[in-house]
Structure formats: structure tokens, C-alpha cells
């Protein structure tokens, strides 16, 4: 029986991974490692779940928290394209924090690491080039924001670490998973959009080109892919060692506005008029200036305006081919759970 650690286990995706690990037959203990205290810690009658408050940049505390662990699912990250954190803060957690986790793997002889990367490790790029493809599609990877850059650099670090020698001459095996836009219960950004629509009289004003198609994935299915990858990476001859995979399911691929409308229409939200691009650009520039001068974050800035209006559509079944992944939640269930959470959080 194994001991698993989930860094960022109090977060949006991490919490769902912990929930699913409770049903994993080969897991005896789950260590939930996060810098923040979980206000609603998950409990179980069949698994030992230990919560450890820890900064992943503190090597000594990380080493202590991970001592005795067999496998790490590393989800901890600062996900920010709105200006809440400085560039240095984002790099410190996302890149250097991942360095710390890898160093602990080497020092403690931990043989398996599943890393939560991001679609932004690939794109959309700073040029606004559309992406339609799979893990092996050629694309100009040129990050336009420090968050995307940090996830790209960390992913490369984890991929390079695969098959490296650790304590007692054993090998470290790694795998990277790249969620597309995650949604579901606990999605704070979705909640903000819903609250804005309510404030505008149940109207969703459109800000995104209808042709800017984006792939989405339900949080439960993204979590399941992590749990499944953690199982398969331990098999001799596993295909996933040293590879990266997009997280996907059968959620609709469409623009952000259309996706939100599909999800929220049963909650009484109606489509509104389209805000002119010149006006959005003006507000984005204004918000960028506020961020620079006053450290004031904003959902609308020049970066978010560009990436939301740039197609990023994943068409792949590589996770199914290499580790037998298939979604465990269908779209109807995913949407219903998300709607229920939005209503209950009002």
C-alpha cells in the first residue's frame, strides 16, 4: 500500500484529486500539502488523510512533509494572468517550487511524479496564432505572459528529470498533464462571471469572438486523469513515463462566452449585446496601467483579451491510447454539478 502526496491539495483541482484517491485501492495514506489551510478538510473512514501546511519553496519543510511518500501529484501553483501577483512571485512558486519538489524526490528516493502543467505551457502564443491539434502538433511556443512562461519552464524541468538517478540508484519517472480551461464546482472565475451577469440583470454581455474556439475540461475528469496517470506510471514499460498529455473530455468546444452561456442559461442568464473590440481594448489598456501603477488586478487586460480571442482547440485521444483514460463524468453531470454549485454559492 502506497503513500501519495498532493501538493496544492486544498486548491480547485487538488481537492478533487484527493477525493478520487480515497477510492484508489493501492493508496493507504494521502498527504495534502498546501501553503493555505483548507477550511473544509476532506475526511475518510477508509484512508489516512494528513493535512500539512507547507511552503513548497522551503526545502527542509518539503523534505519533512514528503518523507515516506511513494508518489507525488504536484498541482501547487499560482494561476494568475490578472495581475494579482508579481512576476517574481509567480516564477518563485511555479518554477522554483517545482525545482524544490524535484530536489526532494532525488533526496528522498521518491520514484514517481505527476505534474500538473497547463495548456498555456503550449499556447495561445504571444502572436495570437490559433492552435488546433494534439500533443505532437507543431506550434510556435512563445509565451506572452509570465504565468505561461513559468508553466512552460516547469514542464520542461519535469520532463528532463524523467529517468534521472535518485537515492540508492533508483530512477525517477515523471509525467506532465496539461489541463485546458478547467470548470466545475469550486471554479472561482466562473463564479465571478455568474455574479457579474446577475448584477447586469441576468445579461451576459459578449466580449469574445464566436470563432475563437477553446477546449474545456470538467474538474472531475481532469482529476481522474491525474489519478489514472499516477497508477499507470508505476507499471513496468509504461508509455506515459517522460510524456505530456492534454487533459480533455467531451465538454463543448466553443468560445468562452458561448460556453458560459450554455452552462448558465438554465440559471436564467440571457445573451446580451457584443461590446465593441475598440472599447474592450481601451479598457484593457487602462487596466494594464492600473496594474503597473497601483498593483490592481483585473479580469480584462491586453493579455486576457488576446488569449480569449485566440483559438486553442485540443483534438487528441493519446491519454486513452497510453493509459486507458476515458472521462468518468459526462457533460450533463458536469454542467448540473457546476450549476448547482453556482446557485448554492450565491
Swiss-Prot record:
The gene is OPG174. Its EC number is 1.1.1.145, 5.3.3.1. NAD(+) binds at residue 151. GO terms for biological process: steroid biosynthetic process. Pathway: Lipid metabolism; steroid biosynthesis. Pfam families: 3Beta_HSD. Induction: Expressed in the early phase of the viral replicative cycle. This is 3 beta-hydroxysteroid dehydrogenase/Delta 5-->4-isomerase. InterPro entries: 3Beta_OHSteriod_DH/Estase (IPR002225), Lipid_A_modif_metabolic_enz (IPR050177), NAD(P)-bd_dom_sf (IPR036291). Belongs to the 3-beta-HSD family. SUPFAM superfamilies: NAD(P)-binding Rossmann-fold domains (SSF51735). It catalyses: a 3beta-hydroxy-Delta(5)-steroid + NAD(+) = a 3-oxo-Delta(5)-steroid + NADH + H(+); a 3-oxo-Delta(5)-steroid = a 3-oxo-Delta(4)-steroid. The active site is at 147 (proton acceptor). Keywords: Early protein, Host-virus interaction, Isomerase, Multifunctional enzyme, NAD, Oxidoreductase, Steroidogenesis, Viral immunoevasion. It comes from Vaccinia virus (strain Ankara). Catalyzes the oxidative conversion of Delta(5)-ene-3-beta-hydroxy steroid, and the oxidative conversion of ketosteroids. The 3-beta-HSD enzymatic system plays a crucial role in the biosynthesis of all classes of hormonal steroids. During viral infection, steroid production contributes to virulence by inhibiting the host inflammatory response. It comes from the Viruses.
Amino acid at each position: 500500500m502506497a503513500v501519495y502526496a498532493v501538493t496544492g491539495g486544498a486548491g480547485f483541482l487538488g481537492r478533487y484529486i484527493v477525493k478520487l484517491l480515497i477510492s484508489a485501492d493501492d493508496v493507504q495514506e494521502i498527504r495534502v500539502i498546501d501553503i493555505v489551510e483548507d477550511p473544509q478538510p476532506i475526511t475518510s473512514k477508509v484512508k489516512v488523510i494528513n493535512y500539512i501546511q507547507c511552503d513548497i519553496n522551503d526545502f527542509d519543510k518539503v523534505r519533512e512533509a514528503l518523507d515516506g511518500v511513494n508518489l507525488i501529484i504536484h498541482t501547487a501553483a499560482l494561476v494568475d494572468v490578472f495581475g494579482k501577483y508579481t512576476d517574481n512571485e509567480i516564477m518563485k512558486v511555479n518554477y522554483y517550487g517545482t525545482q524544490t519538489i524535484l530536489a526532494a524526490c532525488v533526496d528522498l528516493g521518491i520514484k514517481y511524479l505527476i505534474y500538473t502543467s497547463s495548456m498555456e505551457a503550449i499556447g495561445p502564443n504571444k502572436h495570437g496564432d490559433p492552435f488546433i491539434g494534439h500533443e505532437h502538433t507543431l506550434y510556435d511556443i512563445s509565451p506572452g505572459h509570465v504565468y505561461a512562461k513559468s508553466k512552460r519552464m516547469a514542464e520542461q524541468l519535469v520532463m528532463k528529470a524523467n529517468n534521472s538517478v535518485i537515492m540508492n540508484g533508483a530512477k525517477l519517472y515523471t509525467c506532465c498533464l496539461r489541463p485546458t480551461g478547467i470548470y466545475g464546482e469550486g471554479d472561482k472565475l466562473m463564479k465571478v462571471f455568474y455574479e457579474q451577469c446577475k448584477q447586469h440583470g441576468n445579461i451576459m454581455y459578449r466580449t469574445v469572438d464566436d470563432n475563437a474556439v477553446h477546449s474545456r475540461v470538467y474538474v472531475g475528469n481532469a482529476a481522474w486523469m491525474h489519478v489514472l496517470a499516477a497508477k499507470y506510471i508505476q507499471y513496468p514499460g509504461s508509455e506515459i513515463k517522460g510524456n505530456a498529455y492534454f487533459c480533455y473530455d467531451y465538454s463543448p468546444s466553443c468560445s468562452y462566452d458561448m460556453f458560459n452561456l450554455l452552462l448558465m442559461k438554465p440559471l436564467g442568464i440571457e445573451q446580451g449585446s457584443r461590446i465593441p473590440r475598440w472599447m474592450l481594448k481601451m479598457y484593457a489598456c487602462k487596466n494594464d496601467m492600473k496594474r503597473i501603477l497601483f498593483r490592481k488586478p483585473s479580469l480584462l487586460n491586453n493579455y486576457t483579451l488576446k488569449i480569449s480571442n485566440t483559438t486553442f482547440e485540443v483534438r487528441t485521444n493519446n491519454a486513452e491510447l497510453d493509459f486507458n483514460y476515458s472521462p468518468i463524468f459526462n457533460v450533463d453531470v458536469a454542467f448540473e454539478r457546476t450549476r448547482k454549485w453556482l446557485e448554492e454559492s450565491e
